[in-house]
Amino acid sequence: MFDISFSEILVIAAVALIVIGPERLPKVARTLGHVFGWAQRYVNDVKSDIQREIELDELKKWKASVEETGRSIENSVHTELDKFRETVEAGAEASAMPPPTTAPAGESSPPQNSSPAPAEPAPPPVQSTKNSDPAGPGVNRERETAE
């Protein structure tokens, strides 16, 4: 973390032993260890907070991008739906209008009825009872007379 070599640490320890003295040196070393540990934890906490903020920033950007894409898709769907609605309404209006007549100016045509006239049912066929064969038309009569 501080780029201090082992020989530099030995020099610092020797100076501390001379200045502080052998009785208080263990207590001071323990206190310095706690302070360095606290500083390292604080630095690590700050790093992790910064990392979380960066990730949140990236997620917010990604979320905004996804929302923008969603709005774009929604707008295009609404646009296409409106076009489709206009087409359907135009088709409904066109089918509701009567067809234009194309008769020449000199001739007059009778008004055309859009529905066909109802047809009358045809009368049932009348069968003649004279010379009619009750057995039917396909029966061989020669056999009956020969017996």
From Swiss-Prot:
<keyword id="KW-1003">Cell membrane</keyword>
<dbReference type="InterPro" id="IPR018448">
    <property type="entry name" value="TatB"/>
</dbReference>
<feature type="compositionally biased region" description="Basic and acidic residues">
    <location>
        <begin position="67"/>
        <end position="88"/>
    </location>
</feature>
<keyword id="KW-0472">Membrane</keyword>
<dbReference type="GO" id="GO:0033281">
    <property type="term" value="C:TAT protein transport complex"/>
</dbReference>
<protein>
    <recommendedName>
        <fullName>Sec-independent protein translocase protein TatB</fullName>
    </recommendedName>
</protein>
<keyword id="KW-1133">Transmembrane helix</keyword>
<keyword id="KW-0813">Transport</keyword>
<dbReference type="Pfam" id="PF02416">
    <property type="entry name" value="TatA_B_E"/>
</dbReference>
<dbReference type="GO" id="GO:0008320">
    <property type="term" value="F:protein transmembrane transporter activity"/>
</dbReference>
<dbReference type="InterPro" id="IPR003369">
    <property type="entry name" value="TatA/B/E"/>
</dbReference>
<feature type="compositionally biased region" description="Low complexity">
    <location>
        <begin position="103"/>
        <end position="117"/>
    </location>
</feature>
<comment type="similarity">
    <text>Belongs to the TatB family.</text>
</comment>
<keyword id="KW-0812">Transmembrane</keyword>
<keyword id="KW-0997">Cell inner membrane</keyword>
<comment type="function">
    <text>Part of the twin-arginine translocation (Tat) system that transports large folded proteins containing a characteristic twin-arginine motif in their signal peptide across membranes. Together with TatC, TatB is part of a receptor directly interacting with Tat signal peptides. TatB may form an oligomeric binding site that transiently accommodates folded Tat precursor proteins before their translocation.</text>
</comment>
<keyword id="KW-0653">Protein transport</keyword>
<feature type="region of interest" description="Disordered">
    <location>
        <begin position="67"/>
        <end position="147"/>
    </location>
</feature>
<feature type="transmembrane region" description="Helical">
    <location>
        <begin position="1"/>
        <end position="21"/>
    </location>
</feature>
<keyword id="KW-0811">Translocation</keyword>
<comment type="subunit">
    <text>The Tat system comprises two distinct complexes: a TatABC complex, containing multiple copies of TatA, TatB and TatC subunits, and a separate TatA complex, containing only TatA subunits. Substrates initially bind to the TatABC complex, which probably triggers association of the separate TatA complex to form the active translocon.</text>
</comment>
<dbReference type="GO" id="GO:0043953">
    <property type="term" value="P:protein transport by the Tat complex"/>
</dbReference>
